Amino acid sequence: MAVYNYDVVVLGSGPAGEGAAMNAAKAGRKVAMVDSRREVGGNCTHLGTIPSKALRHSVKQIIQFNTNPMFRAIGEPRWFSFPDVLKNAEMVISKQVASRTSYYARNRVDVFFGTGSFADETSVNVVCANGVVEKLVANQIIIATGSRPYRPADIDFSHKRIYDSDTILSLGHTPRKLIIYGAGVIGCEYASIFSGLGVLVELVDNRDQLLSFLDSEISQALSYHFSNNNVMVRHNEEYERVEGLDNGVVLHLKSGKKIKADALLWCNGRTGNTDKLGLENIGLKANGRGQIEVDEAYRTSVSNVYGAGDVIGWPSLASAAYDQGRSAAGSMVDNGSWRYVNDVPTGIYTIPEISSIGKNEHELTQAKVPYEVGKAFFKGMARAQISGERVGMLKILFHRETLEVLGVHCFGDQASEIVHIGQAIMSQPGEANTIKYFVNTTFNYPTMAEAYRVAAYDGLNRLF
């Protein structure tokens, strides 16, 4: 068994692992990265964020082609199969792997491909694909192994008609009808993707409102858009059993209803990838969802072992995971780059997309905060009229006395980009965080960014 010595060993090369490894390396530490694949990037690059967003982009282009009257002059609407669209999206994965591989090489981070597990608190055994075991000894170790779809034991995921959000990328045909169980972020994103391909979608939600953490007006807008695009949303439903057939699948619900479709996509929760880490060898224990507990410095109960990303739970976003990894390494090397990551914008890549940051109306009402609302509807924006993306709105919540911006909520094209302007103002200290910034600033014209000016005037005009 070969033995290698490092200052820091990072388990997992997804966003959290990459952020941790890069920050530790730039602080002068000798760093090793361990990943179970033969390529870096983690589930984010290979099965999650990158392929699903590339898929979405391709589907959005198809929708634009099929709905734009200008293109009718050159032909009829075109139909694309899911495998064809996926093949186009997969090209992005190889480009991401190449970019990320170069980051590790440039920063002198050694990458080991194999399954890593703790031998003790300062050493990790890596079982390579050829069976060779290598031992990495380190002063500090960061767990950033990510997560995978939660799979209930009573569902046969080996059935050819039953998929989760990882295996759906191996779907070799375009179903006429698809059941999606779980209406969280992933479920809603895939509902948009498949409905955009003309698939009838049954979206089963075990709550009474889609994405209930969102501002209710935004959630309602998404619900309306789904119902207008061949997505049947069924609220307050729980599965009883899933019956796989040769020609389809039947979802039996506890309410007594039955739904039949060509395939079922399970999108109900995720599990941390901790079961093969040998946590028992260092006295750590994951919770029922495979997640480990950390403090605000991202340190576990074992003083030299840290955690970041999906494996520690909330918010389970790639954007947050990268910053958590950087912060875990910053805390570890004490280079001033540590911060507890909690001011995270939400980005949901439905069609149209959704993004928000800060408080929503329900939260402010419950807290008895005297707030006011300003809105800008995209249908009135010149840039939206030019692009044809006229569905959507920007909503600003602000304190009616101090004018402090308390929340920004956006539904529509480029929402995940638009929200960052509001995020920047909300992060300003004291009186610099004010809705007046948007009326005292000149925006390029025509842009979607000027929706902030329109929404700010709308809100300020409500004051008396």
UniProtKB/Swiss-Prot annotation:
It comes from the Bacteria. The keyword Lipoprotein does not apply. Its EC number is 1.6.1.1. InterPro entries: Class-I_Pyr_Nuc-Dis_Oxidored, FAD/NAD-bd_sf, FAD/NAD-binding_dom, FAD/NAD-linked_Rdtase_dimer_sf, Pyr_nuc-diS_OxRdtase, Pyr_nucl-diS_OxRdtase_dimer, STH_gammaproteobact. GO terms for biological process: 2-oxoglutarate metabolic process; NADP metabolic process. Its main location: cytoplasm. Keywords: Cytoplasm, FAD, Flavoprotein, NAD, NADP, Oxidoreductase. The keyword NADP applies. Its cofactor is FAD. One of its GO terms (molecular function) is dihydrolipoyl dehydrogenase (NADH) activity. Signal peptide: none annotated. FAD binds at D35, S36, R37, R38, E39, V40, G41, G42, N43, C44. One of its GO terms (cellular component) is cytosol. It is found in: Cytoplasm. It catalyses: NAD(+) + NADPH = NADH + NADP(+). Binds 1 FAD per subunit. Conversion of NADPH, generated by peripheral catabolic pathways, to NADH, which can enter the respiratory chain for energy generation. NCBIfam families: PRK05249.1. Belongs to the class-I pyridine nucleotide-disulfide oxidoreductase family. This is Soluble pyridine nucleotide transhydrogenase. The gene is sthA.
